[in-house]
């Protein structure tokens, strides 16, 4: 038996749409997070933190005190199946209560400078004069709450002082 070559009037592979239609409820993406010596919390590529994980984080805070640094996922302003959006990232950062929180994993819908403005407003640096519509929309997605220090991370950012609650970095 030799190779079969379809006639030129037939496609060599079945023609089928690449689109898929969800068949059920979309469930949030739970990924691994890391807590290092009670002072650094890293949660990336996640859109949900289960209650039992929150219980572990809260117990650790009782034992070790306030975490120094939290590094938290934020793909874009709107939530995604497998990533936090701005609202979820800020809510998570508030609940973790670290001295400083940094966001990672952005796509390119919003510029780094715009994320700096939006997240800076969360700790009271809220000078909205001349803000772009994207920035106004972004801050509007974040629920009101206690001010916290939260900024977008970037390549080359160096964070020091994880012990003792005095956190410094080479950019902010």
Model segments located where?
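Core dinuclear metal-dependent hydrolase active-site scaffold
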Residues: 1-56, 154-172
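Binuclear metal-ion centers of metallo-dependent hydrolases, dominated by the metallo-beta-lactamase
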Residues: 50-172
